[in-house]
Regions:
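FAD-binding core/adjacent interface of flavoenzyme oxidoreductases
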Residues: 1-12, 66-132
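Beta1-alpha1 glycine-rich phosphate/pyrophosphate-binding loop at the start
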Residues: 7-69
């Protein structure tokens, strides 16, 4: 894919919040790029549900449809996507360096939105499973 190197806004993170932010910026007429280290949009919440959950609730198809809808919304709103890109440096002036299997790319933007989300890190301690 041939990317422009300069954008009005770059969003780091293609989860629900990042996609929403990118859509809002695009609707205001900005040229937007969304960067994510995953192979598609959706974020951590769609990464890997427990197998027992998928078997009981058959949610994997629904989650794939949500990812497809995210991607369709981004494409329809002329938002560039850089999937499988890991951000390794953000310099003053919003110079964003990413890398993937093809090498390093430097992007620049007037605005930067960091929507990388979160995931739980369990730190066990005595009594940590006790309610209250």
């Amino acid at each position: 894919m041939d990317f422009k190197k300069e954008y009005d806004t770059i969003v780091i993170g293609a989860g629900p919040s990042g996609v929403k932010a990118a859509l809002k910026c695009s609707k205001k007429g900005q040229k937007v790029l969304i960067i994510d280290s995953n192979q598609n949009s959706g974020g951590q919440i769609y990464r890997a549900p427990p197998k027992s959950y998928v078997k009981k609730n058959n949610k994997s198809l629904e989650e794939n449809l949500i990812q497809i809808k995210f991607s369709e919304h981004l494409k329809k709103n002329n938002i560039d996507t850089a999937y499988n890109h890991t951000v390794w440096q953000v310099s003053p002036g919003f110079k964003i360096n990413t890398f993937n299997e093809e090498g390093v790319i430097e992007w620049s933007a007037k605005n930067l939105i960091v929507a990388t989300g979160t995931y739980e890190k369990i730190i066990p301690f005595e009594g940590w499973t006790t309610p209250g």
